[in-house]
Design a protein with these regions (language model features):
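Structural signature of eukaryotic scaffold interfaces centered on beta-propeller domains
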Residues: 135-152, 192-195, 234-243, 282-297, ...
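Short loop/turn segments immediately following beta-strands, especially the blade-tip
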Residues: 212-217, 260-268, 315-319, 360-364, ...
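Loop/turn-rich, solvent-exposed surfaces of beta-rich toroidal or solenoidal domains
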Residues: 389-393, 400-402, 427-509
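Electrostatic cytochrome c docking/interface patches
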Residues: 22-49, 143-146
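Extracytoplasmic electron-transfer domains, predominantly the class I c-type cytochrome c fold
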Residues: 36, 40, 56, 61-65, ...
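Asp-box/WD-like beta-propeller blade repeats and closely related beta-sheet repeat scaffolds
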Residues: 226-307, 320-328, 333
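Structural motif
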Residues: 167, 209-211, 255-259, 309-313, ...
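A short beta-strand motif characteristic of beta-propeller blades
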Residues: 177-182, 218-225, 266-271, 275-282, ...
Length: 550
């Protein structure tokens, strides 16, 4: 199956093509297949797996976004065996090979094939009354330490997502030792750091937020809350005079955001995001809140409304008279980050193959830039190009290309908001690119590529000599682990910018690790192998996250 997909579609976004375009091309010529029945227990298992593994790309209601529409109207035309094979083998365009990687058992693959042929489950809403029942303050502010009670270099701590165990590991970046492992929500998507640097806020895909106090002798969660059934984003207020006052969380389901007290996570307001698409003005039931960032120019949170293509500037200076500014941008907004000046925000509209540039000082759209197939930058990578000046880089899920966009409209206006150069990487399935102001290297992962050699290694470019192409670092081999896919995901620098950390992400039943590379020499420096490091994915250095260094 994989050879067939690769041969027909190469590095294009094959998952979208196969699940969407094939139906359009053949339509009713594909025979209707009877839906194999699911028992109640099987449906519950399938629904749980879908929410944990699939909803992020395909949507809670399965109507598609980064991934294609997989409602039964489409999947039944493809048929059970076709769907089962696709789940098993994946595609070079970003669809993981759930079966051959070992992430799902053969039984689970079979259940999921039947699940996506079945009618869509309607999830419940999650209102303020529901949210309040989950709110817990384990350590009230008045009982927390007045000053730091440990000897850790807080700015060089890494918060590491342990995806499938519902935990984060805090790792000392100086000693490479695990400080503690903290129970959180399931599959923490991101860690964000308060303006003061004292607190780490983490949010699980199940909508649970934990607030971790780094001043404690052993850092731990001091408050928690569940803001929805499915979520991806959390942020804190950072504008001068408003530091640490508020936190905000954005939900995939229900489509809403919640602003909370920054000391306790007490929910203060809940605002729904349902509305019309920016272009066709069609009402949408599921405009999910994707990335949220804190403005450097005024007391505002800036958030992406994925399906409807709008970016909201939410003024948190007066919650009782809430003011929002809506920027009409592009549909299927996902993630992104600031340029070097932190004035302009670049966000990926990945299903539209575009990057949206927003001027956060003026709260206006600056430009929309066409890039390669399904851009997925994480927060992107800023560096000084030897020819074009400051650029921001994004890799892609759908092909092997890395797009470099000029980001200096003041001193290099001729290059601003244009793709000034395109680099060719190892393949599709990339989730993150990363560099550092002190680094001469640009690192590109390919974690979701179905080719094991590509998924288990990293491409690295010399910023001063991009024409040379990339070198390959065999991170999976360096880990010493022999089993599994050993997907290498999310390069992350330490505070000093002289080390880069990589997650070696295996299935829950297999060994995983963290590999640390000397940035200057590109040589292996250290491997963290510990039975507590289970399915590590995202890693967030406190200093770099707090100061938007990427």
């Amino acid at each position: 199956m994989f050879k067939t997909v690769a041969g027909l579609f190469g590095s294009v976004a094959a998952s979208s093509y196969l699940f969407a375009q094939t139906v359009e091309a053949k339509g009713d010529n594909i025979p209707q297949t009877d839906v194999p029945a699911l028992t109640e227990d099987e449906f519950d298992r399938g629904n749980k797996i879908f929410q944990q593994r699939c909803a992020g790309c395909h949507g809670v209601l399965r109507t598609g976004a980064t991934g294609p529409d997989i409602t039964p109207e489409r999947t039944r035309k493809l048929g059970y065996q076709y769907v089962k094979d696709f789940i098993t083998y994946g595609s070079p365009g970003g669809m993981p090979n759930w079966g051959t990687s070992g992430d799902l058992t053969a039984d689970e693959v079979e259940i999921m094939a039947r699940y996506v042929l079945s009618d869509v489950a309607q999830p419940p809403d999650w209102n303020l009354s529901d949210i309040k029942t989950t709110w817990e303050v384990n350590v009230p502010p008045e009982k927390r330490p007045k000053k730091k009670q440990n000897n850790y270099n807080l700015e060089n701590i890494f918060s590491v997502t342990l995806r499938d165990t519902g935990e984060v590991a805090l790792i000392d970046g100086d000693t490479k030792k695990i400080i503690t492992v903290i129970m959180t929500g399931y599959a923490v998507h991101i860690s964000r750091v308060s303006a003061s640097g004292r607190y780490i806020f983490v949010i699980g895909r199940d909508g649970k937020i934990n607030m971790i106090d780094l001043y404690m002798k052993v850092p731990d969660s001091v408050a928690s809350i569940k803001i929805g059934m499915e979520a991806r984003s959390v942020e804190t207020s950072k504008f001068k005079g408003w530091e640490d006052k508020y936190a905000i969380g954005g939900c995939y389901w229900p489509p809403q955001y919640v602003i909370m007290n920054g000391d306790t996570l007490e929910p203060l307001i809940v605002e729904g995001t349902r509305g019309t698409t920016y272009d066709t003005y069609e009402y949408h039931r599921e405009p999910r809140v994707a990335a949220i960032v804190a403005s450097h120019y005024r007391p505002e949170f800036i958030m992406n409304l994925k399906e409807i293509g709008k970016i909201l500037f939410v003024d948190y200076s007066d919650l009782h008279n809430l003011k929002t500014t809506t920027v009409r941008a592009e549909r299927f907004l996902h993630d992104g980050g600031f340029n070097f000046s932190k004035r302009y925000l670049l966000m990926a509209a990945n299903a539209r193959n575009r990057i949206v540039v927003v001027d956060t000082k003026e709260a206006k759209l600056a430009k929309i830039v066409d890039v390669s197939i399904k851009p997925h930058p994480g927060r992107g990578a800023n560096f000084l190009h030897p020819k074009f000046g400051p650029v921001w880089a994004t890799s892609a899920l759908g092909d092997e290309m890395i797009s470099l966009i000029g980001t200096d409209p003041d001193k290099n206006p001729q290059h601003a908001w244009k793709v000034v150069e395109t680099l060719e990487g190892q393949g599709g399935g990339s989730l993150f690119v990363k560099t550092h102001p002190k680094s001469k290297n640009l690192y590109v992962d390919t974690a979701l590529n179905p080719d094991e050699d590509i998924a288990s290694s990293i491409a690295v470019f010399d910023i001063k000599n991009l024409n040379k192409g990339y070198d390959v670092l065999p991170i999976g081999d360096w880990s010493g682990i022999k089993e599994g896919m050993r997907r290498i995901v999310q390069p992350e620098f330490n505070k000093n910018g002289d080390e880069v950390w990589f997650s070696v992400w295996n299935a829950k039943s297999q060994e995983s690790a963290i590999v640390i590379v000397d940035d200057k020499t590109r040589k292996l420096k250290h491997v963290i192998r510990d039975k507590r490091i289970v399915t590590p994915t995202g890693k967030f250095n406190v200093f770099n996250t707090m100061h938007d260094v990427y």
